C-alpha cells in the first residue's frame, strides 16, 4: 500500500501531468481471523482484484448474512452516497439466468468455487432484453437495494468502472483489542491507534490480525500482535524486555504489574521467578523440565518440582508420559476429508478421486471450459479453463471471429458446399467459381489482368509484384498503386498536388479505370451465348416461313434442346480475400 501511495504522489511531481486518483482505503472491520476493507475510487474489476491481491487478500466473498452485515457496517462508516462496490463474484462465460445455476446464477467466486448460503440480487427476473451474458462481474450497492440497509447485487460489465471495491483478508491468528484501565485512560488521556498488515488504520476494531501494531499515547509504547511459536493464539508484546504502563494490558505481565517504585515492573509468585523477557514467570524446576519431555513441559504450580508433558497438535502422549507419537487422523469417524485421507507425521492431507479437484476442503467436478461457449460447430477444451473452436472439414475459423466458421480451400479445386435438400444450391469460398455443378474452381485473376505487371496466382487469391514505377516497388501487394512520373522533372507542371504514397499495412482501393474484372468477362460470355441462341431461333423461324423441307426443319429445329446452365455471377469488383 505504501508503494501505491508513493507512486500516486511522485508521478505527478516528476512528470508535471495529472494522473488518475488511486482508490483510497476507507472503513475496515475484522472478525476473528477475517478482515474486510472498503476502498473508494473508480476502478475496473481487474484493477480492483489486483489491488486486493497485492495486499495479500482478494475481492470479498459474501457467502452468508454475516458477511452481508459486514458490508452494511463498512458502508455506514464510509458515509458515501450509495456507491457501487465490486465484490469477488464473476461470470467468465455464458449468460446469467435466475432460473438456472443455483443462487449464484452461474457466477463463481474469485476463489474458484460457488459455495454460498446467501445471495441478494437486485434484479429478480430476466428483463425484456433477455439475460445479460459474460463477461460479467458483480457490484453491491445501497442504491439497488429493494429495502433500506440491505445492499443488493447487480451484474455489471467487468470493463466498466465501479465507485470502489471490497477486499477480504484471512489470517491464521488474531489478537483482541488492548485492555486499557478506564480510570487511568480518562486521567491520562490514553488513546490507542492500530495499524493492520493490509494498511488499515484506526482505533475501533473488534479483532486485530497477527502482524498488526498498536501505538499507545501518551506513553509512546509500540506493541505488536504475534503468535508465539507452538501456540495457536496471538497476543500483544514487544521486543524490549520489561513491563510498560500497568494501565495498558496489565503492562504485559503474566501475573501482577506494579508501579509502586515509580517505573512499572512485573511481579511473580514466591515459588516462581521472572524470566529474561521481564514479563513471564517460571518455576525453579522449569529450567530442566524441557529436557524430560519430547515436546512441551508444563510445571505444576500446586506441587513444586512436578510437571506435566504435553504434545503438539497431531500427536498424543505415549505410554511413558514423556514421548509423543503421531495420531492417525485418517481413522477418525466421521472422516476429516470428503473423499481420500492420507496421514502424515503430525498432520494429514486430503485428496480427491480422479476427475475431481479439491476446492476449500471439498471435492468438486472441474467446470467444463466449453460450458456456455458459442462455437458454431464444435468446442474443444485445451486446458481446465480454456478452449478453442474447431470447424468441419472444408471450413476454417473466421480470423476476426474464431467462434464462427467459413469455407476454406487451399487447392485449385475443392468440392462445393451444397444443400442436401436442394442439390442445385451450392456455395464456394471467396475467389472460387462453381464449375460442373459440384466443384469449386479457383479463379485465375492473373489471366484477367488484375496486375499491371508481374502476377502470381494463389488458391482463392493472387499477388502483384510491384514494378519500379510503383510506390511499393519490389513489394508484394494486390494493388501496386501505379503513379505517373514526370520525365522532364518540371515541378510546376501537372495538378500541383504531390503523389499520394499508400500508408503501410493498408491496401489501397483499386482504381476505377483498369483491366476488366473476371466477373465482367464471364457476364459478357454468357450474354454472347444467349445472343447466338436467339439468332438460331430466329433463323429457324425464317426458314419455316420460306417453306423449307420438313425433314430439314426437323433436323434443325426438332432436335432436343440443349440445356444451358447459367451460374449467377456478380459484376462488381471481387473483394480481396484473406
Swiss-Prot record:
Tissue expression notes: Expressed in lung, liver, spleen, kidney, pancreas and lymph node. Low expression in heart, cerebrum, urinary bladder and uterus.
Residue ranges that the UniProt entry lists as topological domain Extracellular: 17-518
Signal peptide (from-to): 1-16
Chain residue ranges for the region called Disordered: 483-512
Gene3D superfamilies linked to this entry: Laminin (2.10.25.10), Mannose-Binding Protein A, subunit A (3.10.100.10)
One Pfam family this sequence matches: Lectin_C
Positions glycosylated per UniProt: 114, 300, 410, 493, 495
Keyword Ligase assigned: no
Chain positions found as (3R)-3-hydroxyasparagine: 343
GO terms for biological process, alphabetical: blood coagulation
Domain called C-type lectin: residue spans: 31-167
Disulphide-bridged cysteine pairs: 137-158, 246-257, 253-266, 268-281, 289-297, 293-309, 311-324, 330-341, 337-350, 352-363, 370-379, 375-389, 391-405, 409-414, 418-426, 428-440, 446-455, 451-464, 466-480
Membrane spanning stretches: 519-539
Keyword list, A-Z: Blood coagulation, Disulfide bond, EGF-like domain, Glycoprotein, Hemostasis, Hydroxylation, Membrane, Proteoglycan, Receptor, Repeat, Signal, Transmembrane, Transmembrane helix
InterPro entries assigned: C-type_lectin-like, C-type_lectin-like/link_sf, CTDL_fold, EGF-like_Ca-bd_dom, EGF-like_dom, EGF_Ca-bd_CS, Growth_fac_rcpt_cys_sf, NOTCH1_EGF-like
UniProt keyword Disulfide bond present: yes
Top-rank lineage group of the source organism: Eukaryota
Compartment(s): Membrane
PTM summary: N-glycosylated.
Annotated GO MF terms: calcium ion binding; transmembrane signaling receptor activity
Function: Endothelial cell receptor that plays a critical role in regulating several physiological processes including hemostasis, coagulation, fibrinolysis, inflammation, and angiogenesis. Acts as a cofactor for thrombin activation of protein C/PROC on the surface of vascular endothelial cells leading to initiation of the activated protein C anticoagulant pathway. Also accelerates the activation of the plasma carboxypeptidase B2/CPB2, which catalyzes removal of C-terminal basic amino acids from its substrates including kinins or anaphylatoxins leading to fibrinolysis inhibition.
Protein name (record): Thrombomodulin
Organism: Canis lupus familiaris
Amino acid at each position: 500500500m505504501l508503494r501505491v501511495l508513493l507512486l500516486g504522489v511522485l508521478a505527478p511531481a516528476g512528470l508535471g501531468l495529472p494522473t488518475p486518483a488511486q482508490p483510497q482505503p476507507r472503513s475496515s472491520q475484522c472478525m476473528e481471523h477475517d478482515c474486510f476493507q472498503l476502498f473508494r475510487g473508480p476502478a475496473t474489476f481487474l484493477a480492483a482484484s489486483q489491488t486486493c491481491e497485492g495486499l495479500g487478500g482478494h475481492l470479498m466473498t459474501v457467502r452468508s448474512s454475516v458477511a452481508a452485515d459486514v458490508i452494511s457496517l463498512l458502508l455506514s462508516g464510509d458515509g458515501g452516497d450509495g456507491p457501487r462496490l465490486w465484490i469477488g463474484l464473476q461470470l467468465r462465460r455464458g449468460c446469467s439466468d435466475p432460473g438456472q445455476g443455483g443462487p449464484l446464477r452461474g457466477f463463481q467466486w474469485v476463489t474458484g468455487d460457488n459455495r454460498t448460503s446467501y445471495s441478494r440480487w437486485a434484479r429478480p427476473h430476466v428483463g425484456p432484453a433477455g439475460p445479460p451474458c459474460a463477461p460479467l462481474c458483480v457490484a453491491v450497492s445501497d442504491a439497488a437495494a429493494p429495502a433500506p440497509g440491505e445492499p443488493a447485487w447487480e451484474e455489471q460489465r467487468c470493463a466498466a468502472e465501479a465507485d470502489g471495491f471490497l477486499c477480504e483478508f484471512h489470517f491464521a491468528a488474531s489478537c483482541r483489542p488492548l485492555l486499557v484501565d478506564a480510570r487511568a485512560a480518562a486521567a491520562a488521556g490514553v488513546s490507542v491507534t492500530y495499524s493492520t498488515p493490509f494498511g488499515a488504520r484506526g482505533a475501533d476494531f473488534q479483532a486485530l490480525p497477527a502482524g498488526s501494531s498498536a501505538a499507545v499515547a501518551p506513553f509512546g509504547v509500540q506493541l505488536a500482535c504475534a503468535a508465539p511459536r507452538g501456540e495457536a493464539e496471538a497476543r500483544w508484546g514487544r521486543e524490549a524486555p520489561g513491563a510498560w504502563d500497568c494501565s495498558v494490558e496489565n503492562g504485559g505481565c503474566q501475573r501482577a504489574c506494579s508501579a509502586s517504585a515509580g517505573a512499572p515492573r512485573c511481579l511473580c509468585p514466591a515459588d516462581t521467578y521472572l524470566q529474561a523477557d521481564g514479563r513471564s514467570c517460571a518455576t525453579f524446576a522449569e529450567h530442566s523440565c524441557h529436557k524430560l519431555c519430547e515436546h512441551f513441559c508444563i510445571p505444576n504450580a500446586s506441587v513444586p518440582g512436578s510437571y506435566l508433558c504435553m504434545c503438539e497438535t497431531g500427536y498424543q502422549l505415549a505410554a511413558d508420559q514423556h514421548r509423543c507419537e503421531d495420531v492417525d487422523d485418517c481413522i477418525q469417524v466421521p472422516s476429516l476429508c470428503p473423499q481420500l485421507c492420507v496421514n502424515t507425521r503430525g498432520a494429514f492431507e486430503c485428496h480427491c478421486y480422479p476427475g475431481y479437484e479439491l476446492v476449500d476442503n471439498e471435492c468438486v467436478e472441474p467446470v467444463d471450459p466449453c460450458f456456455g461457449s458459442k462455437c458454431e460447430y464444435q468446442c474443444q477444451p485445451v486446458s481446465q479453463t480454456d478452449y478453442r473452436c474447431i470447424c468441419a472439414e472444408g471450413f476454417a475459423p473466421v480470423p476476426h471471429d474464431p467462434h464462427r466458421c467459413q469455407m476454406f480451400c487451399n487447392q485449385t479445386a475443392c468440392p462445393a458446399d451444397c444443400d442436401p435438400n436442394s442439390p442445385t444450391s451450392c456455395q464456394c469460398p471467396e475467389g472460387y467459381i462453381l464449375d460442373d455443378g459440384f466443384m469449386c474452381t479457383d479463379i485465375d485473376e492473373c489471366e484477367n489482368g488484375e496486375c499491371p505487371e508481374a502476377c502470381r496466382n494463389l488458391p482463392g487469391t493472387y499477388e502483384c509484384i510491384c514494378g519500379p514505377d510503383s510506390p511499393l516497388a519490389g513489394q508484394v501487394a494486390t494493388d501496386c498503386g501505379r503513379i505517373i512520373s514526370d520525365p522532364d522533372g518540371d515541378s510546376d507542371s501537372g495538378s500541383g498536388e504531390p503523389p499520394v504514397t499508400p500508408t503501410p499495412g493498408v491496401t489501397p482501393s483499386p482504381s476505377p479505370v483498369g483491366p476488366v474484372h473476371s466477373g465482367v468477362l464471364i457476364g459478357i460470355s454468357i450474354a454472347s451465348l444467349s445472343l447466338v441462341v436467339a439468332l438460331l431461333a430466329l433463323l429457324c423461324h425464317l426458314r419455316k416461313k420460306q417453306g423449307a423441307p420438313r425433314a430439314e426443319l426437323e433436323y434443325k429445329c426438332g432436335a432436343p434442346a440443349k440445356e444451358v446452365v447459367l451460374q449467377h455471377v456478380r459484376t462488381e469488383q471481387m473483394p480481396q480475400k484473406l
